[in-house]
């Protein structure tokens, strides 16, 4: 009987030690995740009244012991985005905090339980919303009203200058902004077709469908007319989305950008942007804003439209793992430092605008 007991004991010891190793590794991984997803700033939920409803926001402030801070107000890009952009903003907020700046963002209407529907908004509606948030922030004793600026990505390019025309801002950070809605839509369409290796025939057919959509928009066609024109195939379009595009498809930032003259502007562009024609964006920004000498342009060759590393974004698995275990590493090399350096630089309180001239698929 004795010799038979030893193998069972050895097997039990192996199982126990295997379990211990698994638990140690799991604990270590959990520790890494918690550490990497902890940020050197304080966060609080805030409520901002605007237009008879409430904006549900997040205010992130530095842990530097100062009583007052400058503020970066966030203007989202396209889509149903919550205040933290599913925590994707937090590494950028941390960079702002290192420069002594707080960050303010809010859930889009209809997102995360917020009242309203973001698809009902025009770019002017979005600008009014941001201006109201700035007014709310200026009334707070912990915010330096002379150091409030804007940060906006993609679709926000049509909103940022409208905000600056409504209320004074000290600076603007524009990330992958477009200039003209229709040009941007056509650029994106062709870029995606090239990326897919589309044939000439497929490309011609896609352009023809896009041209049909443009004609329908120009005629103020209803969603039902759009669906009929496509032979009954909505191709993912919804009535609400069609209404949103109908409100905004004529957007063009060229004239509005004049409101940013004399304001420090950081234009951030990606080398692998298939959503926005960055060459067109840079050309227009330089043409309109170089006169005041306050424009800074930063290029990130390895970045995508979202300023993430292309090598990571092209893989869903890499994106997920990096977001969990090293979220700051998602961004293109130098991007977070570049944001911080801009805020650390000369952003004079006197360089404030206000009162200036005030993915679409088409």
PLM regions and their residue ranges:
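Short beta-strand element of the alpha/beta-hydrolase
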Residues: 67-77
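Accessory cap/linker subdomain of secreted extracellular hydrolases
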Residues: 173-259
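Conserved alpha/beta-hydrolase
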Residues: 93-113
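The serine-hydrolase catalytic nucleophile loop
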Residues: 82-92, 108, 279
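Alpha/beta-hydrolase active-site loop
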Residues: 120-141
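Short alpha-helix in the alpha/beta-hydrolase fold that links the catalytic acid
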Residues: 276-287
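N-terminal cap/lid segment of alpha/beta-hydrolase-fold proteins
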Residues: 32-67
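Short beta-strand/loop motif that positions the catalytic acidic residue
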Residues: 260, 267-269
């Amino acid at each position: 009987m004795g010799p038979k007991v030893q193998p069972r004991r050895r097997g039990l010891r192996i199982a126990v030690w295997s379990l211990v190793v698994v638990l140690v590794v799991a604990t270590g991984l959990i520790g890494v995740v918690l550490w990497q997803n902890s940020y050197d700033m304080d966060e609080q939920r805030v409520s901002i009244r605007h237009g008879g409803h409430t904006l549900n926001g997040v205010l992130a402030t530095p842990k530097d012991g100062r009583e007052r801070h400058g503020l970066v107000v966030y203007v989202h890009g396209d889509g149903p985005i919550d205040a933290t952009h599913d925590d994707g903003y937090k590494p950028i907020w941390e960079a702002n905090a290192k420069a002594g700046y707080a960050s303010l963002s809010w859930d889009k209407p209809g997102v995360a339980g917020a009242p309203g529907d973001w698809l009902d908004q025009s770019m002017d509606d979005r600008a009014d919303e941001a201006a109201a948030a700035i007014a709310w922030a200026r009334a707070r004793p912990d915010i330096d009203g002379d150091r409030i600026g804007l940060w906006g990505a993609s679709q926000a390019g049509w909103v940022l200058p409208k905000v600056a025309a409504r209320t004074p801002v000290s600076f603007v950070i524009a990330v992958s902004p477009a200039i003209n809605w229709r040009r941007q839509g056509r650029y994106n369409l062709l870029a995606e077709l090239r990326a897919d290796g589309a044939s000439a025939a497929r490309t011609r057919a896609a352009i023809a469908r896009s041209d049909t959509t443009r004609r329908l928009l120009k005629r103020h066609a209803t969603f039902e007319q759009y669906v009929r024109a496509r032979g009954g195939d909505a191709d993912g379009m919804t009535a609400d989305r069609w209404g949103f595009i109908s409100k905004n498809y004529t957007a063009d930032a060229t004239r509005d950008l004049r409101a940013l003259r004399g304001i420090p502007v950081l234009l951030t562009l990606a080398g692998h942007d298939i959503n926005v024609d960055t060459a067109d964006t840079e050309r227009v920004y330089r043409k309109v804003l170089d006169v005041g000498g306050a424009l800074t342009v930063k290029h990130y060759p390895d970045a995508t439209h979202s300023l993430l590393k292309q090598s990571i974004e092209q893989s869903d698995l890499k994106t997920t793992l990096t977001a969990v275990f090293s979220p700051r590493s998602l961004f293109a090399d130098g991007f977070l430092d570049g944001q911080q350096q801009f805020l650390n630089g000369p952003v004079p309180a006197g360089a404030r605008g206000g009162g200036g001239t005030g993915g679409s698929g088409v």
